[in-house]
UniProtKB/Swiss-Prot annotation:
GO terms for molecular function: structural constituent of ribosome. GO terms for cellular component: ribonucleoprotein complex; ribosome. One of its GO terms (biological process) is translation. Belongs to the bacterial ribosomal protein bL28 family. It comes from Protochlamydia amoebophila (strain UWE25). Coiled coil: none annotated. This is Large ribosomal subunit protein bL28. Keywords: Ribonucleoprotein, Ribosomal protein. It comes from the Bacteria.
Length: 91
């Protein structure tokens, strides 16, 4: 599964894209009506990030979401990597 955050586990979710027509009620119209609905995927905001791992004196490359990057800033790289390894992921 390529579009999965290695830290938080965020992955694509499914949803719909709605086609609407009409004039909104606050513009004195009859309201917006749904005329169609198409399936779509909501992609997580992922990117590859190269992070210096000082405890092992090397860089590690992780596929992260923005929420995971904030988690790493808050907890530190060592705590996050320790939790990942406890869950069986290789880093």
């Amino acid at each position: 599964m390529s579009k999965v955050c290695q830290v938080t586990g965020r992955k694509p979710t499914r949803g719909y894209k709605y086609a609407i027509r009409g004039i909104a009620k606050k513009k004195k119209g009859i309201g917006l009506k749904v005329t169609g609905k198409t399936k779509r995927r909501f992609q997580p905001n992922l990117f590859k990030k190269r992070i210096w791992f000082a405890e092992e004196n090397r860089f590690i490359t992780l596929k992260l979401s923005t929420a995971a990057l904030r988690t790493i800033d808050r907890l530190g790289v060592f705590a996050v990597v320790r939790k990942m390894r406890a869950n069986g992921q290789s880093v």
